[in-house]
Curated annotation (Swiss-Prot):
Residues 22-42 are annotated as: Disordered. One of the primary rRNA binding proteins, it binds directly to 16S rRNA where it nucleates assembly of the body of the 30S subunit. With S5 and S12 plays an important role in translational accuracy. GO terms for biological process: ribosomal small subunit biogenesis; translation. The gene is rpsD. The lineage of its organism: Bacteria, Bacillati, Bacillota, Bacilli, Bacillales. The keyword Lipid metabolism does not apply. Keywords: Ribonucleoprotein, Ribosomal protein, RNA-binding, rRNA-binding. One of its GO terms (molecular function) is rRNA binding. This is Small ribosomal subunit protein uS4. It comes from Bacillus mycoides (strain KBAB4) (Bacillus weihenstephanensis).
Length: 200
């Protein structure tokens, strides 16, 4: 399944979650798009709830179904809770951590920064958004990319960097000090439903 490239706000409303991270998509119309307005949402079946939860998380991280399922399967081979491990692996993606650093306003924009070669890990350029960052690795903006307007604008509006990243705004770099804990990740996601979906 290809990555979704359509209207992000419409998709956010359909899934009932802010994919941009700003919450603006749901401020005026916190219901699915369509001619029937807020009264059109039907009660979902158990399968429907599981599918919706999977789609929420997949679109939140901007992944194809194949990438998403591969990461899910890898999480299942780790000790501990399958769902929590899955969330932690998703959070360790390079494009996501660039977004968490505040170098981009959305994960989609962060993925573009990585794709276009503006990001390094431990000094080496990495242009693979799905690259899994390991604890104690350092993520930086390439020196020749420091003046990018999109990065400067994103830094100006960002006021939160999670505790598992130590960010130096002057150097535009951060160290991924540890894996995220489940309590630090999206509270609106019920990963148990996703485990149930793939276990059917």
């Amino acid at each position: 399944m290809a990555r979704y490239t359509g209207p992000a706000w419409k998709l956010s409303r359909r899934l009932g979650i802010s994919l941009s991270g700003t919450g603006k998509e749901l401020e005026k119309r916190p219901y699915a798009p369509g001619p029937h307005g807020p009264n059109q949402r039907k009660k979902l079946s158990e399968y429907g709830l599981q599918l919706q939860e999977k789609q929420k998380l997949r679109h939140m991280y901007g992944m194809t179904e194949r990438q998403f399922r591969r990461t899910f399967d890898q999480a299942g081979k780790m000790p501990g809770k399958h769902g929590e491990n899955f969330m932690i692996l998703l959070e360790a993606r390079l494009d996501n951590l660039v977004y968490r650093m505040g170098l981009a306003r959305t994960r989609r924009a962060a993925r573009q920064l990585v794709n276009h070669g503006h990001i390094t890990v431990d000094g080496a350029r990495v242009d693979i958004p799905s690259y899994r960052v390991k604890p104690n690795q350092t993520i930086s903006v390439r020196e020749k990319s420091n003046s990018l307007v999109v990065v400067k604008e994103a830094i100006e509006v960002n006021n939160f960097v999670p505790e598992y990243l130590t960010f130096d705004a002057d150097k535009l770099e951060a160290t991924y000090t540890r894996h995220a804990e489940r309590s630090e990740l999206a509270a609106e996601i019920n990963e148990a439903l996703i485990v149930e979906f793939y276990s059917r």
